[in-house]
């Protein structure tokens, strides 16, 4: 990765604003750089995050799985609307896996078919884990898999004891709330923004986020 031409001081100031959740335009005004410079630097930070989080280890124990849909350019956030799966026109489908009490993993998917979701679950979830899902038919394959499957029917029961997927749905809400501030995310950059949200969720401490970014920047950009 090519080194940045920005001074170390400017880079660290931009990192602090990135961690705080500022937009590139706001950070540019506060640091005193061109808005395009700040936007490009934020893009490079997201590239570093993307590379780092892809090395996540598989989850074991109690795991929640769910799919959600994101608007891109013109994105307005909010909860799922309209049809799911192939009928979700104008939206990008994303699959998420969350270990209860732990971390989340996300992946942009072409569709929410069983043939798409099952290989991801087999790669990212340890066999014999307990998997909670909603009633989407694509998850029926879990009934004859190496996982212990519990299905939640939202129309009849939202949450009772451990029988829920509140954790992954909480992540969706956080991710969409974060992306709303950008007033639209280009399709080609959406995976980077998604992994940024994943990273923030998995590392909720700003101090930890700052430390990790400075470490990666020192290694790759300075």
Predicted segments with their positions:
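Residue-level recognition of single "structural anchor" positions
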Residues: 1-222
């Amino acid at each position: 990765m090519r080194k940045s031409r920005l001074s170390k001081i400017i880079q660290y100031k931009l990192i602090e604003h990135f961690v705080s959740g500022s937009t590139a335009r706001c950070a540019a005004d506060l640091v005193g750089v061109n808005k395009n410079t700040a936007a490009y630097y934020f893009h490079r930070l997201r590239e570093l995050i993307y590379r780092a989080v892809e090395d996540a280890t598989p989850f074991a124990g109690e795991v929640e799985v769910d799919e959600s849909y994101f608007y891109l350019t013109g994105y307005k956030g909010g909860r799922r609307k309209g049809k799911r799966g192939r009928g979700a026109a104008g939206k990008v489908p994303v699959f998420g896996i969350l270990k209860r009490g732990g971390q989340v993993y996300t992946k942009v998917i072409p569709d929410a078919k069983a043939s798409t979701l099952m290989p991801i679950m087999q790669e990212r979830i340890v066999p014999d884990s307990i998997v909670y899902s909603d009633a989407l038919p694509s998850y029926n394959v879990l009934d004859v898999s190496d996982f212990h499957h519990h299905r939640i029917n939202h129309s009849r029961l939202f949450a009772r004891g451990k029988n829920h997927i509140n954790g992954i749905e909480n992540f969706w809400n956080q991710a969409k709330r974060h992306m709303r501030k950008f007033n639209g995310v280009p399709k080609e950059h959406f995976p980077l923004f998604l992994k940024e949200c994943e990273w923030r969720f998995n590392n909720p401490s700003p101090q930890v986020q700052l430390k990790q970014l400075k470490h990666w920047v020192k290694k790759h950009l300075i």
